[in-house]
């Protein structure tokens, strides 16, 4: 199988989709049959599950979710840091800046949420954001127009226009601070 070959030649194996518990999710069974060691990581983030990390042979294994925005989010925030550490670079957290929102938001608390956001202007040096509507995880088009992630902490229930939130720009150039 491709996983067997990769486990003998690659430093890191990354897959997307097929890691959950449904009938079509075959990777956990295959991974076990090949002698891999893995753990489903319960991350309290949205989007971002299921996420599996482990080893297959000498390779680090990252099993990312299947929805496009979930894949991008978990790789950008977790996978890329793993690769940097594996390559011997120091670990660094993404740049976060304060931004204002131009929307209202009501949400259930409990998980940190990373929602694709677009800078639509500036209030002085502070970016003003618009965000993707809920249900965005399967729509890759939300990433095409996004400048970064609006970050909503686990305890946040409501935002009103003019409130602030953290913003993680995809490019430091987008921050313009």
Language model regions located:
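Flexible glycine/proline-rich
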Residues: 30-177
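N-terminal small/polar loop signature for handling phosphorylated ligands or for N-terminal nucleophile
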Residues: 1-33
